[in-house]
């Protein structure tokens, strides 16, 4: 998704600066590429392995008969992923571009200048991989594979190549066919090192974003494009996403976060904002980190709403807001506080939770946009609690010395139901100083008893949110166990 969202931000910014200049956001689908490896996260891996080397647009859908091909199945998922983010884009399929002849003129040029292109690519390959190097990959008319073909002669005057189906590459199983074939009309495609240059030339691309692992590929593609007589687009390399262990997120093994998962635990605008910020810094992207990203977004949304109208257009939030997006959140409540409230109450009763939230800060229901955002966050918190917190929640049985500390807090709260968050926080610190060498050591005890977890929020504000009455109930329940 980042490969589509991030260029859309550049496009929006450009259109604001160059009013009236038409732009196109192209999403290119490499559905004519040969399958080199069976992904680990798909069904029917054995059946799919028989089609290694074939264009993915010709491989049966491993997920069943819901789509005519593997590529169409994945394309349907892309459409589903992009639907919630309100991006205007043009979908371009490799198979259609080659098959319709849209790439034919560029292919003729590549064929005519194949030797110059080979001389650019060859130094980037190991010596043993240079034999048979060709910018053109014919589709074998006998077995339908593309990874197995090896060009043996070029005939640019007739837009033809001679080739044999004998190369064992990327799992391909060559059939041994030998013959001559046109490179036009979908009968061939270019190799992956020439892909970008072909597209940039044929589609007149001005701007391209890519991961930092493709910096060398972009540089190489620019050199090839110059051979074709084109001008390389402006490039923008971005950093990779990391999982919670700091490893690069891999699509092939299914690591990462899907859009469906994200929207279960957070508004889609939070994802858009996350992808907008710091694209040249590696950032961790995993489900358990979402609550912090939500609060980062809410802070930015408050700043956006507080800005003068003429200044909002330059605020990052303005690029991610959608037609249905609340444009304000007039409360200091955080997603973390809402999640901790849900955890402490241990209920999915929406009305009860909402009453607690409005009781703590009536501003959450002060206007339709803030209220709508608040209820979206409440639903997200309930989902996150059910999936991540509740399954790991353990009831803590306090020791004798700890029980005395809890009784002291119960007595204070029972006698001071109207105490402020600051007064409650001070009492907790006083108890910490009385019982530990460092006052902060009391907090893990209270988090275990009140929330069933090791860490948590500032307790003064949280106890005010969840109400001293409810906290006394939980503390007494722990003391009676």
Labelled PLM ranges:
Residues 213, 218, 228, 238-383, ...:
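Catalytic adenosine-cofactor/nucleotide-binding cores of aminoacyl-tRNA synthetases and other
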Residues 14-18, 82-89, 114-121, 147, ...:
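A generic secondary-structure signal for well-formed alpha-helical elements
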Residues 89, 202, 304, 311-326, ...:
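Short amphipathic alpha-helical segments and their helix-coil junctions
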Residues 17, 24-26, 118, 126, ...:
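Basic, alpha-helical terminal appendages of large translation-related enzymes
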Residues 2, 66-70, 94-98, 131, ...:
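Conserved aromatic-histidine-acidic binding/catalytic patches
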Residues 1-118, 221-222, 228:
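N-terminal Rossmann-like or analogous alpha/beta NTP/dinucleotide-binding catalytic cores
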Residues 87-91, 95-253, 259:
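Active-site cores that bind ATP or allylic diphosphates and position pyrophosphate for catalysis
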């Amino acid at each position: 998704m980042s490969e589509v969202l991030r260029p859309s931000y550049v496009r929006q910014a450009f259109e604001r600066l160059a009013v009236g200049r038409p732009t196109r956001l192209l999403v290119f689908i490499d559905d004519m590429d040969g399958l080199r490896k069976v992904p680990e996260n798909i069904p029917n891996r054995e059946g799919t392995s028989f089609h290694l080397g074939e264009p993915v647009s010709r491989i049966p859908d491993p997920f069943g008969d819901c789509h005519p091909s593997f590529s169409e199945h994945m394309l349907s998922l892309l459409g589903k992923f992009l639907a919630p983010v309100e991006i205007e884009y043009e979908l371009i399929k490799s198979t259609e571009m080659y098959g319709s002849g849209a790439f034919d003129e560029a292919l003729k040029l590549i064929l005519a200048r194949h030797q110059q292109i080979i001389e650019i690519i060859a130094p980037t390959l190991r010596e043993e991989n240079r034999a048979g190097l060709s910018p053109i990959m014919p589709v074998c008319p006998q077995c339908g594979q593309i990874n197995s073909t090896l060009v043996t002669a070029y005939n640019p005057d007739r837009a033809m190549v001679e080739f044999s189906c004998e190369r064992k590459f990327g799992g391909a199983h060559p059939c041994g066919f030998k013959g001559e074939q046109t490179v036009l009309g979908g009968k061939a495609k270019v190799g992956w090192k020439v892909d970008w240059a072909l597209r940039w030339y044929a589609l007149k691309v001005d701007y391209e974003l890519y991961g930092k692992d493709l910096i060398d590929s972009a540089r190489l593609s620019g050199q090839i494009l110059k051979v074709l007589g084109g001008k390389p687009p402006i490039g923008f390399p971005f950093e990779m996403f990391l999982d919670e262990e700091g490893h690069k997120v891999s699509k092939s093994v299914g690591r990462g976060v899907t859009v469906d998962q994200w929207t279960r635990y957070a508004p889609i605008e939070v994802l858009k904002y996350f992808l907008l910020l710091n694209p040249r810094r590696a950032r961790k992207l995993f489900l358990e980190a979402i609550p912090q990203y939500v609060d980062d977004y809410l802070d930015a949304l408050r700043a956006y709403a507080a800005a003068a109208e003429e200044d909002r257009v330059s605020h990052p939030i303005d690029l991610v807001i959608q037609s249905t997006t609340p444009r304000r959140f007039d409360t200091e409540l955080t997603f973390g506080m809402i999640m901790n409230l849900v955890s402490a109450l241990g209920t999915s009763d929406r009305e009860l939770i909402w009453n607690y939230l409005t009781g703590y800060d009536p501003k959450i229901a002060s206007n339709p946009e803030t209220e709508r955002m608040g209820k979206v966050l409440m639903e997200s918190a309930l989902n996150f609690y059910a999936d991540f917190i509740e399954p790991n929640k353990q009831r803590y049985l306090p020791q004798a010395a700890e029980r005395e500390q809890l009784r002291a807090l119960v007595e204070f709260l029972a006698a001071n139901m109207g105490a402020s968050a600051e007064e409650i926080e001070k009492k907790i610190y006083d108890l910490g100083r009385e019982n530990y060498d460092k006052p902060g050591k009391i907090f893990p005890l209270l988090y275990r008893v009140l929330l069933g977890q090791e860490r948590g929020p500032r307790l003064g504000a949280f106890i005010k949110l969840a109400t001293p009455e409810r906290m006394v109930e939980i503390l007494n329940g722990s003391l009676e166990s």
